[in-house]
């Protein structure tokens, strides 16, 4: 079960270790670079070869036909659930859609903010046939659709027969995606970043993945010929702040829900007293007995812990220092805490706010910054699928009134051609 640490008894070094995250020490950068180079050099052939090597699949084709997308069908209960999720996710991301605005900063000057959809976006959904991560697709495809991105490309790993799970195909169809490739891993990221004979080169790549996918996204993002990415990615995590009135059964369930993501996931509980910590550990043992992903959970819990800390100021310091992907405030009166949180991917308030709901159906996006990146990154939103540029209108009055200031600043920086561009206009205006 989870190790229990008393915060007040820890040294500063022990406190840092207590909040440290599991690290992937595998040296994969060179392997990923090799994959990227192979895709750049050999295009489609590399994709077929790499899929055979990593997925053990002899693909007959890379792109899923329009007929297969149209004919895909799933059980009615799954279809209803997907449509319900689409409705809430669409509502929230429509709410985030920005409006073009205009301001006059001085007499004769107006500046407009103009938003445009990114023209070509690449969506990556990991998992393959056994675990169709429909929610991951919805969280990317819906804001892309709301933003108005005209070209949306989906890459996801094939099953043993080289096909895509029909739940993914149906969800993609409902979200208006008709360009789907049966490609996974780092090779999928490389294909979308650089393009091949079959795969469209995109402007920005979205979506989670394993360490190879994450490394590939990082590498293509720093290449001027590659593609931008949504955000740095890492293992899933949750931090729960609970008081003595919190239900230990609920707490344990939320911890396990995050732990089952993978062996490198991390869960941390902050609570006031040791009694609740022990009750949660008991519940973890009970609930683990009937869950299916037990090996992932066991490994994840070795990276995780319970922190006993009753000082509210210190509790806030822990939260803001850790900057969790998911924060659950399971306290009697959670709302006042929100004003003091400065770093979190998303915050759930109260006993009934199961993190699972946010993963699927509240409408908020579940693609969130991990590994402490919530200090300087936000969760995925409609804005991530858009660009903004300014439109500046400047008339004669503005040149006359502010031109001399612009010239002075240009000359201060030794840029006489800058100053000249204004002086010529002032000369034309005369006195």
From Swiss-Prot:
| GO process annotations (BP) | L-histidine biosynthetic process
Give the active-site positions.
Answer: 325 (proton acceptor), 326 (proton acceptor)
The record's cofactor note says: Binds 1 zinc ion per subunit.
Q: Which superkingdom is the protein from?
A: Bacteria
Top enzyme class, one word, equals oxidoreductase
Presence of the UniProt keyword Phosphoprotein in the record: no
Catalytic reaction(s) noted: L-histidinol + 2 NAD(+) + H2O = L-histidine + 2 NADH + 3 H(+)
Q: In its keyword annotation, does this UniProt entry include NAD?
A: yes
Cofactors:
Zn(2+)
Which GO terms of the molecular function aspect are on file? histidinol dehydrogenase activity; NAD binding; zinc ion binding
Query: InterPro entries given for it?
Result: Ald_DH/histidinol_DH (IPR016161), Histidinol_DH_CS (IPR001692), Histidinol_DH_monofunct (IPR022695), Hstdl_DH (IPR012131)
**Any Pfam family matching the protein:** Histidinol_dh
The catalytic activity of this protein is classed by the Enzyme Commission as 1.1.1.23
Q: Which residues bind Zn(2+)?
A: 258, 261, 359, 418
CC per GO annotation = cytosol
Could you list this entry's UniProt keywords, alphabetically sorted: Amino-acid biosynthesis, Histidine biosynthesis, Metal-binding, NAD, Oxidoreductase, Zinc
Annotated pathway: Amino-acid biosynthesis; L-histidine biosynthesis; L-histidine from 5-phospho-alpha-D-ribose 1-diphosphate: step 9/9
- PANTHER family membership: HISTIDINE BIOSYNTHESIS TRIFUNCTIONAL PROTEIN, HISTIDINOL DEHYDROGENASE HDH
Family, according to the entry, reads as follows: Belongs to the histidinol dehydrogenase family.
Summarizing the function annotation, the protein's role is: Catalyzes the sequential NAD-dependent oxidations of L-histidinol to L-histidinaldehyde and then to L-histidine.
The record's annotation in HAMAP family points to: HisD
Name this polypeptide is given: Histidinol dehydrogenase
Query: Taxonomic lineage per UniProt?
Result: Bacteria, Pseudomonadati, Pseudomonadota, Gammaproteobacteria, Legionellales
Gene name, per UniProt, is hisD
């Amino acid at each position: 079960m989870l190790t229990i640490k008393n915060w007040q008894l820890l040294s500063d070094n022990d406190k840092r270790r207590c909040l440290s995250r599991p690290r992937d020490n595998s040296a994969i950068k060179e392997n990923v670079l090799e994959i990227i180079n192979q895709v750049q050099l050999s295009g489609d052939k590399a994709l077929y070869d790499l899929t055979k090597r990593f997925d053990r699949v002899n693909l007959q084709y890379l792109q899923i036909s329009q007929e297969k997308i149209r004919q895909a069908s799933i059980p009615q209960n799954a279809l209803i659930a997907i449509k319900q999720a689409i409705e809430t996710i669409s509502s929230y991301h429509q709410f985030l859609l920005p409006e073009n605005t205009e301001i006059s900063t001085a007499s004769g000057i107006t500046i407009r903010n103009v938003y445009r959809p990114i023209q070509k976006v690449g969506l990556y959904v990991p998992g393959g046939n056994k675990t169709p991560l429909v929610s991951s697709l919805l969280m990317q495809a819906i804001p892309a659709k709301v933003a108005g991105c005209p070209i949306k490309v989906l890459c996801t790993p094939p099953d043993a027969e080289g096909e895509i799970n029909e739940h993914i195909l149906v969800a993609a169809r409902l979200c208006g995606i008709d360009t789907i490739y049966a490609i996974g891993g780092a090779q999928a990221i490389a294909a979308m970043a650089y393009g091949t004979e079959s795969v469209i080169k995109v402007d920005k790549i979205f979506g989670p993945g394993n360490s190879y996918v994450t490394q590939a996204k990082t590498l293509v993002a720093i290449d001027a010929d590659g593609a931008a990415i949504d955000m740095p990615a890492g293992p899933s995590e949750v931090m729960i702040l609970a008081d003595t009135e919190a239900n230990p059964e609920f707490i344990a369930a939320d911890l396990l829900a995050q732990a089952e993501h993978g062996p490198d996931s991390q869960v941390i509980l902050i609570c006031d007293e040791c009694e609740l910590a022990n009750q949660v550990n008991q519940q973890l043992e009970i609930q683990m007995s009937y869950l299916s992903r037990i090996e992932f959970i066991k490994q994840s819990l070795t990276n995780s812990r319970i922190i006993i800390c009753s000082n509210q100021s210190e509790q806030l310091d822990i939260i803001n220092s850790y900057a969790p992907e998911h924060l659950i405030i399971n306290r009697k009166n959670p709302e006042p805490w929100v004003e003091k949180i400065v770093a979190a991917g998303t915050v759930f308030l109260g006993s009934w706010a199961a993190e699972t709901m946010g993963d699927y159906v509240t409408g908020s996006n579940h693609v969130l910054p991990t590994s402490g990146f919530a200090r300087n990154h936000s969760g995925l939103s409609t804005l991530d699928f858009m660009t903004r540029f300014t439109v500046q209108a400047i008339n004669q009055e503005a040149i006359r009134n502010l031109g001399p200031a612009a010239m002075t600043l240009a000359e201060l920086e030794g840029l006489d051609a800058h100053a000249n561009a204004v002086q010529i206009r002032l000369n034309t205006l005369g006195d």
